[in-house]
Regions:
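Charge-rich, low-complexity terminal tails
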Residues: 13-16, 138-143, 151
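Acidic, glycine- and Ser/Thr-rich low-complexity intrinsically disordered tracts
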Residues: 19-37, 248-298
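N-terminal segments that cap or nucleate solenoid repeat domains
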Residues: 19-76
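Short, solvent-exposed coil/turn segments
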Residues: 38, 45, 63, 99, ...
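Hydrophobic aliphatic residue packing
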Residues: 45, 61-63, 89, 101, ...
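Secretory targeting and sorting signals
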Residues: 1-18
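Right-handed parallel beta-helix
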Residues: 49-56, 67-77, 95-109, 120-134, ...
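Extracellular beta-strand/beta-solenoid scaffold signature
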Residues: 37-40, 57-59, 77-93, 108-117, ...
Length: 298
């Protein structure tokens, strides 16, 4: 593991990219003043071109069609405990294509260790405010299908996920991550504000209010390719950015121009991991020297 070494690669100075407003509760989610009406349509979307706009949605949405748009809506999500890992918006179906998730507030009324924010492939997520879910965004191609994930995540605000000590998938409680990438090609993560923080679901965890990671890259589903992580704000977590090769011999990621806070979990003696790369020899991470501490931008 070379996390301690990588911590020294977060530089100081002013980045070259044009100024972008940092996503927050005030500039993401349902636009101020937008009137919402209760959504009464199907929760499983099978009609291409369906538009859900300005709705209060009670229930988890399953997308099984092309060119679906969900915008300007408050997703209260389901009231049940899902039978397996899913999301308030589930885009795991092989029939999903060009899903647009724009300017939504995604905060479940009943959080669950199986309920993420948006999960799957073939989607664009912009200006969403996501909180109290298990993971914020889950990204991977369809197992056994195309190698392409085709996901763009931009301008989202993700924070305060829900930690559970009881988690059927992990003996040590939920591994909450703001964004988890498990495989696939063509992934862009840009201009997001991802805070790796948690609130207690059934009690505090080992790491207090720190999640697993703000962003974790682990190839559990497929090899990752053409993945760019650019100009985001990352903070908190056991490590703010974690990169693992997992099931494949190596992992390749571009990680550039990102802004890091200094509030990661302290493992002792001031040992913190803004960026943690589990294997230097099995990882190709370009752009490391272009990442900055947020408090040293000027």
């Amino acid at each position: 593991m070379i996390g301690a070494l990588v911590a020294g690669l977060v530089a100081t100075g002013t980045p070259a990219e044009a100024a972008v407003a940092k996503p927050s509760a005030s500039n993401t989610g349902v636009p101020a003043g937008k009137a919402l009406t209760k959504y009464t349509g199907p929760l499983t979307i099978t009609t291409a071109g369906t538009v859900i706009d300005g709705k209060a949605v009670y229930g988890d949405l399953r997308i099984q069609a092309k060119n679906v748009i969900i915008r300007n809506s408050y997703l209260h999500c389901g009231t049940n405990i899902p039978s397996g890992n899913s999301g308030c918006i589930d885009a795991n179906s092989g029939t999903v294509y060009n899903l647009q998730v724009l300017n939504n507030t995604i905060i479940p009324d009943r959080p669950s260790y199986y309920r993420d924010g948006i999960v799957g492939h073939e989607y664009t997520a912009r200006y969403n405010h996501i909180s109290r879910t298990n993971d914020g965004l889950g990204i991977f191609n369809k197992p056994g299908g195309s190698v392409n994930a085709n996901v763009t995540a931009e301008y989202n605000y993700i924070h305060d996920l829900t930690h559970w000590n009881h988690d059927p998938a992990h003996s040590d409680g939920t591994h909450n991550d703001g964004i988890q990438v498990q495989g696939g090609q063509n992934i862009t993560i840009r201009y997001n504000n991802v805070v790796g923080s948690v609130v207690a679901g059934d009690g505090p965890g080992t790491y207090g209010t720190n999640a697993g990671s703000a962003l974790i890259v682990n190839q559990n589903v497929a090899r990752i390719a053409n993945m760019v992580v650019d100009s985001n704000w990352f903070d908190r977590g056991q490590n703010s950015v974690c990169i693992q090769y997992r099931k494949y011999s190596n992992v390749t990621v571009t990680l550039q121009n990102n802004h890091f806070g200094r509030n990661q979990y302290n493992f002792g003696g001031g040992s913190k991991y803004p960026i943690r790369i589990y294997s230097k020899s099995k990882s190709s991470v370009s752009g490391l020297w272009t990442n900055r501490w947020e408090d040293n931008m000027s």
